[in-house]
Amino acid sequence: IYGIFKRRKEKRRYNKAFDKYYEEMKSISLDSNILSEEEIADRLQYDTKKRPKPNELRIITQLLTEIKSVHEDDIHELNYQTIQTVFQITRFLERELQFGSKRAKIQALKLIQSINGYASEAVLVRFLYHREIELRNSARYTYMWLSQGDPFRFFDEDIGMKLRQWDMMELHAILEHRKKVGYNTPSFIKWVNTSAEENVKIFFINEIRLYNETDSAPI
């Protein structure tokens, strides 16, 4: 019974936030003009001086995810990011990673990719070698998504690193994202040569062909 009441309460909260913010958030995200934080806060009728509640921010990130999934090709990225600044989404995500449950941490890591959010490498680094496999992998993929340093070093450090089908899809999406935003992507040939896992070799061979690394592509 408690679970039913809890779900109903969460649904009411979601509906309230949806009615209050969704259409204006979508309009701002699709606006071709660059809008300031003040303009966006004013359009959303949001008081930036108040401390947003975690439950509210979880719903805001859900709305941002929905907007991104439907309108990804049309979104004005600067305005979309400024919405996140207005709601202090980065602060929320980093607090979830530092103090949240394991489930909350994994959700925050996935959200960073879903909404093209951000968390500092200093916060992420503690999870890159975590004993919990799901948390470790989620952190590594988010690190690959964000980092401009050496984000693929895990393939150098662990030649036995395995990739499931889902991992390959995730990694391909990360490579597409990095290409889109202009981040450096290393040559894949070294992992074709060094990996002990056949499916990892095949994955990177396919990526070489896709990215037209003709000098690196195996014959």
What would you call each of these model-derived segments?
Residues I1-D19:
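N-terminal signal-anchor transmembrane alpha helix of single-pass membrane proteins
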